[in-house]
Amino acid sequence: MACKSSRSLLLLATVMVSVFAAAAAAAAATDCSPGVAFPTNLLGHCRDYVLQQTCAVFTPGSKLPEWMTSAELNYPGQPYLAKLYCCQELAEIPQQCRCEALRYFMALPVPSQPVDPSTGNVGQSGLMDLPGCPREMQRDFVRLLVAPGQCNLATIHNVRYCPAVEQPLWI
């Protein structure tokens, strides 16, 4: 009798350890912290696209090709490259972390590092306060980046929007 209860206890302990190990692995796989699931200097192309769409301007040190920031921008089809590059950046972020990456992107400080003259890259991404184009207007557009009318990317729970994007989970 004692042998049977020992086996049952051992079996129960094994099952519990397996369940806890699976839960820990799942939690580690969905860790959407900045620097873990996505880089902390992310979405430079999305910053350019957001400014292009909301403010009709390009950022100094834009990561877009020079021909896109010139007067030739009015040719049909060229503005879509900014969207394409942004959507590619978002697609590289794990599906369950895209909303958190957008939250982080909206909260980043204004780029303060100088432009690298060889690459044209600004030190960080983030939204910029520009005359006539406040950050809140840009945030409204950032919320739409994963939506069907923009990048059409699935996020957490397989939906194409970010619920409560104003509330960062990493604070």
Swiss-Prot record:
Q: Entry's InterPro entries?
A: Allergen/soft/tryp_amyl_inhib, Allergen/tryp_amyl_inhib_CS, Bifun_inhib/LTP/seed_sf, Bifunc_inhib/LTP/seed_store
Task: State the post-translational modifications.
Answer: Five disulfide bonds, which are essential for the inhibitor activity, are probably present.
Gene transcribed to yield this protein: IAT3
Q: Which organism is it from?
A: Hordeum vulgare (Barley)
Q: Residue span of the signal peptide, if any? A: 1-24
- CDD domains listed in its UniProt record: AAI_SS
Q: What PANTHER family would the database entry show?
A: ALPHA-AMYLASE_TRYPSIN INHIBITOR CM3, TRYPSIN/FACTOR XIIA INHIBITOR-RELATED
Report the function annotation for this chain: Part of a complex with inhibitory activity, but CMd is inactive as a separate subunit.
Into which family does the record put it? Answer: Belongs to the protease inhibitor I6 (cereal trypsin/alpha-amylase inhibitor) family.
Could you give the subunit structure recorded for this chain?
A: Heterotetramer of one CMa, one CMb and two CMd chains.
Q: Where in the cell is it found?
A: Secreted
**What's one Pfam family here?**
Tryp_alpha_amyl
Protein known as: Alpha-amylase/trypsin inhibitor CMd
Expression across tissues: Endosperm.
- Please provide one cellular component term from the Gene Ontology annotations of this protein: extracellular region
Name the principal localization, coarsely classed: secreted
Gene Ontology terms, MF aspect: alpha-amylase inhibitor activity; serine-type endopeptidase inhibitor activity
Q: Which UniProt keywords apply?
A: Alpha-amylase inhibitor, Disulfide bond, Protease inhibitor, Secreted, Serine protease inhibitor, Signal
Segments passing through the bilayer: none
